[in-house]
Amino acid sequence: MQHIRNFSIIAHIDHGKSTLADRLIHFCGGLSDREMEAQVLDSMDLERERGITIKAQTAALHYKAKDGQVYNLNLIDTPGHVDFSYEVSRSLSACEGALLVVDASQGVEAQTVANCYTAIEQNVEVVPVLNKIDLPAADPESARKEIEDVIGVDASEAVLCSAKTGLGIEDVLETVVRRVPPPKGDPDAPLKALIIDSWFDNYVGVVMLVRVVDGVLKPKDRILLMANGAQYPCDQVGVFTPRSVARPQLSAGEVGFIIAGIKELQAAKVGDTVTLAMRPASEPLPGFKEIKPQVFAGLYPVESSEYDQLRDSLEKLRLNDASLQYEPEVSQALGFGFRCGFLGLLHMDIVQERLEREFDMNLITTAPTVVYEVVMNSGEVIRVENPAKLPDQSKIAEIREPIITATIFLPQDYVGPVITLCNLKRGAQVDMRYHGRQVQLIYDLPMNEVVMDFFDKLKSVSRGYASLDYEFKEYRAADLVKLDLLVGGEKVDALSVIVHRASAQYRGREVAAKLRGLIPRQMFDVAIQSAIGSHIVARETIKALRKNVLAKCYGGDISRKKKLLEKQKEGKKRMKQVGNVEIPQEAFLAVLRVDEGK
């Protein structure tokens, strides 16, 4: 065990985690030159295209150090995006060390700080690595100073490397061997293994990625999952080098996989403890906190006949993504669909894209909303995640909205516009600190303002330089109202949103105007109205298309023309009573993108 080192790589998006992982794998001979490809550990097409890591991946490497010993290094690559921060905390709980990768030309950014604090909380040895030192803009000294100022980690021995050119990779490995402590654990104690991740494989069933803390596991052993008491025969154990390689056993301190013919992913919950049925451990390992979805949206198939297919697709996605939650719901406007819970907007975007890509679904998505706490007059508190389910205003004592604490890092040139943006979004400034050229702003912001379009706005006012990290703080009472949209006098439940009273009227006008341009003209007038309760705050009318019924009258008596016009008017009136208006998918998206910064 003295020769095992478990470490993960943490960094902000685009600071070069995955490239560094590639270099380390290549250097240790995990893959030959022919098999090597960029971002080996990002196995999803989507991860490659967007250049982000979504699922944590592992690789077991052999490294012959300068002291002549051969070390087993278990590398875990983690995501950097704020939506997937729970993936990071899971990966860190399996490690004794973490490489904190900082781009030498960019310095410290928001997720660097967040992930680093997660590591420090879990008592993981943090090893700073300054990457991209081959760039002309690299400034390792100021990056070093920022690490010490902002995070408070000693960076005097930070390793300088360039993952792209392979410069300094050996120094990184030597530092890992020297500074990361070997795992503690007792190979003779009863088996305890923590499930870090689990996913579904079509051939072998559920694959569990585990960190063995105590004991030894061999194929043919009967394993017991401590959360639900289920037992399974273990078929195969092994490690990823990133390819899966079977091993005769997994022992204390190692990170590897277990295949035990488990059919449903819900059985192998992440954070559960695996032990032996014959000789179980007395108590499970401390798991992870259950993650709660922050953002909800309705997903509906465009063709109602595809409802079952959507349900199957969501079930399959859930096999790989335990944080996705969904339940069936019915909308008068869109028919049958699902209310899905996501970790954040990026997560929602990715789930939607995977459904469209991997399962060929055509989807309509409603506006994302957050969970509100509604206090009724009776004193009862209910949670509302769908604006259409908000109780009648007369029964409500108060509505509380979720508040998040956002940490924003940005160059000081952009402080003005970013503060203006935060104030527009009803933010309250908590703190502001200067670190060299960088500024750290801390704001309390209402979550529903962030869900709408805060992230895109932040990027545009700071020219892409600002980075954001946020965490949930509390529920706070606010003056919120439900804004309904009526098309042709009918409420369209899927277009309802909960907004702050101060911006309700403005928003109602904006949405109505936007819908007017998107709903195609009909043969009759269509009124689009925004309403708060029974109070109409805005109205737009889509004018009817009409045929010129007088075209065939040449001269002749006026009464003949009047008769034709009256007949047309009657027809339009009748159409208006029975006609219904189809609302295109763009209209649902337009409600999200009502631009408040005009």
UniProtKB/Swiss-Prot annotation:
Its EC number is 3.6.5.n1. It catalyses: GTP + H2O = GDP + phosphate + H(+). SUPFAM superfamilies: EF-G C-terminal domain-like (SSF54980), P-loop containing nucleoside triphosphate hydrolases (SSF52540), Translation proteins (SSF50447). One of its GO terms (cellular component) is plasma membrane. Residues 2-184 form the tr-type G domain. PROSITE patterns: G_TR_1, G_TR_2. It is found in: Cell inner membrane. One of its GO terms (biological process) is positive regulation of translation. It comes from the Bacteria. The keyword Protein biosynthesis applies. Transmembrane segments: none annotated. One of its GO terms (molecular function) is GTP binding. It is a peripheral membrane protein. Keywords: Cell inner membrane, Cell membrane, GTP-binding, Hydrolase, Membrane, Nucleotide-binding, Protein biosynthesis. GTP binds at D14, H15, G16, K17, S18, T19, N131, K132, I133, D134. NCBIfam families: lepA (TIGR01393), small_GTP (TIGR00231). Belongs to the TRAFAC class translation factor GTPase superfamily. Classic translation factor GTPase family. LepA subfamily. Required for accurate and efficient protein synthesis under certain stress conditions. May act as a fidelity factor of the translation reaction, by catalyzing a one-codon backward translocation of tRNAs on improperly translocated ribosomes. Back-translocation proceeds from a post-translocation (POST) complex to a pre-translocation (PRE) complex, thus giving elongation factor G a second chance to translocate the tRNAs correctly. Binds to ribosomes in a GTP-dependent manner. This is Elongation factor 4. It comes from Aromatoleum aromaticum (strain DSM 19018 / LMG 30748 / EbN1). The lineage of its organism: Bacteria, Pseudomonadati, Pseudomonadota, Betaproteobacteria, Rhodocyclales.
